[in-house]
């Protein structure tokens, strides 16, 4: 077994026992990137010098008997949406090409303090707007299970890097499913924490009331360990929740016997791939065999979730992206004749088609005469969606559903059909509108060898419950041991 075949916690155990060094693991990760990334294209940039320096420092701490954390020395990748001091950060956009942040995002600082070498920045849909990684301004990433297909998005580079075993884990962000959907498409675990559980300070904003960073790993236990490092209140983020952080690993092995798990009937609809439905329904039966009770529940306003999301998220994006004008950082149009030209030409040249589409949608929703009819109404429906979940959680401990309606699709298949692309998040975005935690865990493969994910949704701040439920299923299977055919 190669070092890169180990999970985060397996590697951490070897580091603690002196059976491997962080420098060896980091060099193995860098070698794996060199070997397979020409096919996967998960990385936008690799910080070899920084990662190796951090690895050597980790080895020195372990040698002196003072590791910074249980994960000290475990190499990690970062979605290119997190500000990294001294390392270019683009959010997958031309408009930020060449931007080198002067400080770290809070989660990056926490990872560094915990001793994890950061190997590099991972590809993503531009400003996290997309479900296939094809809106990246630089190149699309490829799914390690079939390189002609998408790894999902917007955190597709993070998912692909973990699935290809280029890194032991990664961080992504989830605004409407951008951690969970690519996790489902790549046989990885993706956890979107409760809104406010993880700091957004230093995370380039898409939709501020929806964005949430989270872990992407090969196993549930790894996700719990990584969440433990990054989950905490942050005075620099006004939306950060001042809620106690539990030990996410404490009850991982507690099982599901006696739990009530809801199955929302609105999440099993026409348009779902038959093989996806079959895999998910088999997972539901597995939970019954493990001692859980399945309960049919209804989330009646789910049918309005997609329209609600695509009013609220673009409205927030149109405001957040107004700051990119060529004056302070990133791209500046060279052929401008006036300040007005600088603004207009920089945005014309710097933003891609999908970002422009969403800015226009959001500007329209907020415009005079349409604000009440569209944006305000969407916010009211958002409240109804949140109330649906509140009622459901009075009956059950968690909800189970597919993560994605289909397995990974061919690159180029949906790029000219925005609505079809938006439908990829139909099962994931209601959770963001309600601010709830959600997790995707591998639950099988199609006949063509494409991964399928099971989504688990929970009460606010019950990430520990989701991890426990996911682990009960994962314990019965070896999906995470399977290697992508690279």
Curated annotation (Swiss-Prot):
EC category name: ligase
Keywords: ATP-binding, Ligase, Nucleotide-binding, Protein biosynthesis
Protein biosynthesis keyword on record: yes
Reaction it catalyzes: L-glutamyl-tRNA(Gln) + L-glutamine + ATP + H2O = L-glutaminyl-tRNA(Gln) + L-glutamate + ADP + phosphate + H(+)
GO cellular component, one term: glutamyl-tRNA(Gln) amidotransferase complex
The protein's Enzyme Commission number: 6.3.5.7
Keyword Ligase among record annotations: yes
Single Gene Ontology BP annotation: translation
InterPro entries: Amidase, Amidase_CS, Amidase_dom, AS_sf, GatA
Highest taxon listed in the record's lineage: Bacteria
Catalytic machinery residues: 79 (charge relay system), 154 (charge relay system), 178 (acyl-ester intermediate)
One MF annotation (Gene Ontology) recorded for this entry: glutaminyl-tRNA synthase (glutamine-hydrolyzing) activity
Entry-linked HAMAP family: GatA
Subunit structure and binding partners: Heterotrimer of A, B and C subunits.
Protein family: Belongs to the amidase family. GatA subfamily.
Stated role: Allows the formation of correctly charged Gln-tRNA(Gln) through the transamidation of misacylated Glu-tRNA(Gln) in organisms which lack glutaminyl-tRNA synthetase. The reaction takes place in the presence of glutamine and ATP through an activated gamma-phospho-Glu-tRNA(Gln).
Record-given protein name: Glutamyl-tRNA(Gln) amidotransferase subunit A
Source organism (scientific name): Myxococcus xanthus (strain DK1622)
């Amino acid at each position: 077994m190669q070092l890169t075949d180990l999970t985060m916690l397996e590697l951490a155990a070897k580091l603690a026992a002196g059976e491997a060094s962080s420098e060896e693991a980091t060099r193995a990760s860098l070698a794996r990137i060199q070997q397979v990334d020409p096919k996967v294209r998960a990385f936008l940039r690799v910080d070899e010098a920084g990662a190796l320096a951090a690895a050597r420092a980790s080895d020195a701490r372990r040698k002196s008997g003072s590791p910074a954390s249980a994960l000290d020395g475990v190499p990690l990748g970062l979605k290119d949406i997190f500000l990294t001091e001294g390392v270019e950060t683009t959010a997958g956009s031309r408009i930020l090409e060449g931007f080198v942040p002067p400080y770290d995002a809070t989660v990056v600082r926490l990872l560094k303090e915990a001793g994890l070498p950061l190997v590099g920045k991972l590809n993503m849909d531009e400003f996290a707007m997309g479900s296939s990684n094809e809106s990246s301004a630089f190149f699309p990433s490829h799914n390690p299970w079939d390189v002609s297909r998408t790894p999902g998005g917007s955190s597709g580079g993070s998912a692909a890097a973990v699935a290809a075993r280029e890194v032991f884990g990664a961080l992504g962000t989830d605004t409407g499913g951008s951690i969970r959907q690519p996790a489902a498409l790549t046989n990885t675990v993706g956890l979107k924490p409760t809104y406010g559980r993880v700091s957004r300070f230093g995370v380039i904003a898409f939709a501020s009331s929806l964005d949430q960073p989270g872990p992407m790993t090969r196993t549930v236990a790894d996700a719990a360990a990584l969440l433990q490092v990054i989950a905490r209140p942050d005075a620099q983020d006004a939306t950060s929740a001042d809620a106690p952080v539990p030990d996410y690993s404490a009850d991982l092995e507690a099982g599901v016997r006696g739990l009530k798990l809801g199955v929302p009937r609105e999440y099993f609809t026409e348009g779902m791939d038959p093989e996806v439905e079959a895999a998910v329904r088999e997972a539901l039966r597995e939970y019954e065999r493990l001692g859980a009770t399945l309960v049919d529940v209804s989330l009646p306003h789910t049918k309005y979730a997609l329209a609600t999301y695509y009013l609220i998220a673009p409205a927030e994006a149109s405001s957040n992206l107004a700051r990119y004008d060529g004056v302070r950082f990133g791209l500046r149009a060279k052929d401008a004749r006036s300040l007005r030209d600088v603004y207009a030409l920089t945005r014309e040249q710097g933003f891609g088609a999908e970002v422009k589409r969403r800015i226009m949608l959001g500007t329209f929703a907020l415009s005079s005469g349409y604000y009440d009819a569209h944006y305000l109404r969407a916010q009211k429906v958002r409240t109804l969606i949140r109330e649906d979940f509140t009622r459901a959680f009075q009956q059950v401990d968690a909800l189970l559903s597919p993560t994605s309606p289909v397995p990974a699709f061919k690159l180029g298949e949906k790029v000219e059909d925005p609505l079809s692309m938006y439908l990829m998040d139909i099962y994931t975005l209601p959770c963001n509108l309600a601010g709830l935690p959600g997790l995707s865990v591998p639950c099988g493969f199609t006949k063509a060898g494409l991964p399928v994910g099971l989504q688990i949704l929970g009460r606010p701040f019950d990430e520990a419950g989701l991890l426990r439920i996911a682990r009960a299923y994962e314990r019965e299977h070896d999906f995470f041991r399977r290697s992508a055919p690279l």
